[in-house]
Amino acid sequence: MPRPHTGNLEQAPSWWPWLVGLTLIALFAGIGLRAPWPADEPRFAQVAREMVESGQWLFPTRGGEYYPDKPPVFMWLIALFYQLTGQLKIAFLLPSALAGLGTLWLVYDLGRRLWGEHVARSAVLILVFTPQFLLQAKGAQIDAVLCFWITLGCYGLVRHFLVGPAWGWYAASWVAIALGIMTKGVGFLPALMLIPLAIWRRRFDESGHQAWRLRAWWGPVLMLATLALWLAPMWLTVERVHSPELLAYRDNILFRQTAERYASAWHHIQPWHYYLTTALPTMWLPLVVLFVLRIRGIMDLWSSDAGLRILLSWVALVLLFFSLSPGKREVYILPALPMCALALACVWEQTPAASRRAASVLLRTVLVLMGVLLIALAGVAWLAPHRLPARADDYAEAVAALAPGVLLLGLALAGIPLLLRKRALFEQLALASLLTWLCIAFWLWPTLDPHRTPRAVLQELERQIAPGTQVGMLEFKEQFLLFAERPLVHFSYLAPLAQQESSAWHWMRADPARVLLVPDHLALRCFDLTRQSVLGQAHRRDWVLLDATALRERCDGPIGHALYRYVPVRKDILS
């Protein structure tokens, strides 16, 4: 069992409660102040909404069509909070925020048990100031919840084998692995921890306790039993109904979205070194800088600290696992961040103050420069908005409204290293991160929200058509379902555009009173886009309305039979 390190923590104890309180505020700040934003948030919110409206939770649906891309746990959580609160605008962000809070507690408690209070606090602060962590904890993507399950799995295994035995936590780790798999297929990653544990964890610890016993095999059995709670009803229902749609759902969720997606990814293709050369240097700053500057300290501790070896080896295995797949995204490596933060905190707290000076000077200087950059950006937004990037034109009004907040944030970031120079580096970085997220949650989100939803387009649609008119969509987006005031018809999200267009053409021919909502960038063969009626812009696309006058005489595209009609049970749920 590793001995706790006394370390030489710089921060005064009186600051710790304030930083904890500010972290709690930052995690939940802004909830209820914005709607789900593309690309992924509207999808998960709409799926959860349909679960509550239909009462059918086993097979997630999107606009009435089965959604086979992700297992259901994350959508279940949003749906549960929607039922509890009655407010989807609140419910869709709660799972990630609570997962972030849970991850912070697990890291703190594990660090305290392995190396003491100082390391535990530093590990929490590292997570707080590493951009990727709060970025995911404050969004409605799957990855923050996945990160919690994986961290819980690692926590249980490490607590049992390094500071145990703790058979209850060992069992909890395998349940967490199962829930992680039911959230996203890579939830099995904590099991990789068994490799370094087998190498460096002896069968008996110094106290004579035996961590490796025959009953350890019950862990994987418990994982399979937990998985069966979802897989068995799903599989049996598919076999009983045996419809093509459910068969396709089962095969997609179990095979195409797991092994096939890993081995033969069809999007986000990147070179093998992508995480080392692109993702880590951007999403894990300044953690990566601290690691590079403390390589020598890691090497010095490697032989004497089994906990450090085990955690860093697991992080390396996770990076290797994702690097071997051709499909790569920055967010995939988020689950490795908590254990990496713990390892860095261990090294940092055993680093003499003199050896920390280079990192402290460098990162404090970067913080000042970031503040100066934000001040300059605010000045440009006020005085010369035409010099901003072209995409800023989409948010011209918002940019002007945000300028005061950007200025204040810039002054705060630049002032922290100067006014609080006696405080510890990690405290300064964490405070800067938390102030940034408070500004984002209370200022940026409400200001940008009208520009990130299709509410204006749908309001114009209601003004142009009669109440009973049937509306169809090509290349439909979930956010339109969230804001719709009437039933919407779509022609399968999964179908290629040519098939959707052909289905829409036949649907409109059957009743000339029907209309079609489409983005105007589509190259359509069955419709005359010169007969369009402009509705407005949403998500950097111009949306138009086509009626029967836009139908061409013939449509030779592939005939599709999929047609889904979504009827909102409760309207204006995001008001």
Residue ranges and their predicted role:
Residues 106, 146-163, 176, 340-343:
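Specific aromatic-rich, kink-prone transmembrane helix
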Residues 25-30, 43-66, 73, 80:
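Extracytosolic helix-loop segments that constitute the early lumenal/periplasmic catalytic or substrate-binding loops
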Residues 2-8, 171, 296-575:
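Membrane-embedded architecture of ER/inner-membrane glycosylation machinery
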Residues 47, 176, 188-330, 339, ...:
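Transmembrane-lumen/periplasm boundary regions of multi-pass, lipid-linked membrane glycan transferases
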Residues 15-21, 107-129:
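Transmembrane-helix signature of polytopic, membrane-embedded enzymes
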Residues 113-114, 153-172, 180, 348-351:
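Membrane-interface transmembrane helices that cradle and orient dolichyl/undecaprenyl
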Residues 94-114, 152:
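Transmembrane-helix motifs of polytopic, lipid-linked glycan transferases
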Residues 93-96, 132-146:
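Short acidic/glycine- and proline-prone juxtamembrane loop motifs at membrane-interface regions
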